[in-house]
């Protein structure tokens, strides 16, 4: 057999194998609330709060790291969780990209910490007007440094990889703080977790100790588009932090954060 033909056959087999490993969106939403599936597939965001009696893992995607974490955290008696799910069609500009090129775009979007700066949330107290949530954001040289570093950028999409970086995020409620951001990359999933590496304070009052907040963004590549699940978990704290000045509603505060992170991701991949 012609050597060139053999090479093409091998490449074809590898391509078919890679594509067959990518799930359909319909294969990973077996627990999703049936009444919300149609609107979810049209791009609506579904939000769940454990303190409202919602089973948050229900809106995470089957067989994913996000699902495993949602189940684990939901079942922890000393935590409360809140999550959201949305579906994002691949941008038209990605039509000519290979699977690996699309995956690389997603990875580098989630690595681009500096682009979080300026993302907004809708403030109901300000008359449903947008307000800046993160006024500053950048990658740090390491977790024990205050020195700003360039955003990390991968040159190729690994099939499987773990990576950690430190970041500085300044938000409208807790001010400037260090966070550790971990990335777990698998064949068709990029799982990003953000954990506070410093105490979170509201004015002069400590709202959360180091490590008590964990947020995640789980991007799952499907044949039809990107299934996105975001989760916030608060460990060992009451839902409301009371101070002599005012009360801080943590579920509301962190739903704003994961909603803003979702909006940031959607905006960045569509640029």
Residue ranges and their predicted role:
Residues 1-4:
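Positively charged n-region of N-terminal signal peptides that target proteins for export
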Residues 8-17:
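Bacterial N-terminal signal peptides
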Residues 23-172:
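Hydrophobic ligand-binding cavity/cleft-lining segments
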Residues 175, 207-215:
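Amphipathic hydrophobic-ligand
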Residues 178-185, 214-221:
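Hydrophobic/aromatic beta-strand elements that line small-molecule binding cavities or substrate pockets
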Residues 186, 193-200, 232-234:
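Generic short beta-strand segments
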Residues 200-207, 240-245:
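Flexible, membrane-facing loop/turn or short amphipathic-helix motifs
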Residues 218-220, 225-271:
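Long, compositionally biased interface segments
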